[in-house]
Amino acid sequence: MQNLSLSQDVLPKHIAVIMDGNGRWAKAQGKPRVFGHKNGVAAVRKTISTSARLGIKAVTLFAFSSENWRRPEEEVGVLMELFMTVLSTEIKKLHKNNLRLRVIGDKSRFSERLQTKIAQAEQLTASNTGMVVNIAANYGGQWDILQATQALAEKVTQGELQPSDIDEDVFKQHLTMADLPDVDLLIRTSGECRISNFMLWQLAYAEMYFTPVFWPEFDENCLIEAVTWFVNRERRFGCTGEQVKALMEN
């Protein structure tokens, strides 16, 4: 792994990753798409371990979108079984390393067996105090905003909340990652330059890093290159460059 000596103040606190390119990578090898998904697991391990060593507070991995159900039934079935297998084989290592696992998204569509496995994995690591690893599965940014809106509407209906009480902070508290900082750095592999309905609210001020590397080939050095690119960015949050520099000097 490359050396990266940086202050925690300049590192991203929350990294989100759209893990793209498994199918195209497999095709280039003359293999079926599922071969790419299985080989992508190694990149997940590397990303989690490297992020933890860097001191990142949270990593969110886009594993399965709400739109991915449209894929061939066989591929979806393999992805669900792969999810089960990875939960079974990786959770003890995450727990040993004091990492906390959470699965975000609409889990009701998963099989009871998978829902049980998810609940067990989350419960095992719930008290861990290290990096939070979010797996976004059957997740969509529009769904996240919709479920938050429905929850707020229910509170208004029940008289627990007035419409005038709802501001950005209140709304955020009803999103699936309310207790985490918004995303600082979004990484998407495979050369595609879009966010694909991922964390629409939380990406408001994220720096977006697009790499041509297919996900199965994304390693420690690739992640460090992305983080290095991030720390050299000037994040403005709506201010001018001069205003940002003045704030940094104070």
From Swiss-Prot:
Indicate which residues the UniProt annotation says bind Mg(2+): 20, 207
Q: What is its EC number?
A: 2.5.1.31
A GO term for molecular function: ditrans,polycis-undecaprenyl-diphosphate synthase [(2E,6E)-farnesyl-diphosphate specific] activity
Q: Which InterPro entries match?
A: UPP_synth-like, UPP_synth-like_CS, UPP_synth-like_sf
Q: Note the Gene3D superfamilies from the entry.
A: Decaprenyl diphosphate synthase-like
Q: Write out the GO biological process terms.
A: cell wall organization; peptidoglycan biosynthetic process; polyprenol biosynthetic process; regulation of cell shape
Task: Specify the domain of life of the species encoding this protein.
Answer: Bacteria
The entry's substrate-binding residues are 21-25, 33, 37, 65-67, 69, 71, 188, 194-196
A cellular component term, taken from the record's GO annotations: cytosol
Catalytic activity reads: 8 isopentenyl diphosphate + (2E,6E)-farnesyl diphosphate = di-trans,octa-cis-undecaprenyl diphosphate + 8 diphosphate
Q: Which cofactors, by name? A: Mg(2+)
Q: List the active-site residues.
A: 20, 68 (proton acceptor)
How the cofactor is bound: the record states: Binds 2 magnesium ions per subunit.
Q: Which UniProt keywords apply?
A: Cell shape, Cell wall biogenesis/degradation, Magnesium, Metal-binding, Peptidoglycan synthesis, Transferase
Per the record, the similarity remark reads: Belongs to the UPP synthase family.
Question: Any idea what job this protein has?
Answer: Catalyzes the sequential condensation of isopentenyl diphosphate (IPP) with (2E,6E)-farnesyl diphosphate (E,E-FPP) to yield (2Z,6Z,10Z,14Z,18Z,22Z,26Z,30Z,34E,38E)-undecaprenyl diphosphate (di-trans,octa-cis-UPP). UPP is the precursor of glycosyl carrier lipid in the biosynthesis of bacterial cell wall polysaccharide components such as peptidoglycan and lipopolysaccharide.
Subunit organization? Homodimer.
Q: Specify the protein name.
A: Ditrans,polycis-undecaprenyl-diphosphate synthase ((2E,6E)-farnesyl-diphosphate specific)
- Recorded source organism is Vibrio cholerae serotype O1 (strain ATCC 39315 / El Tor Inaba N16961)
Q: Which gene encodes it?
A: uppS
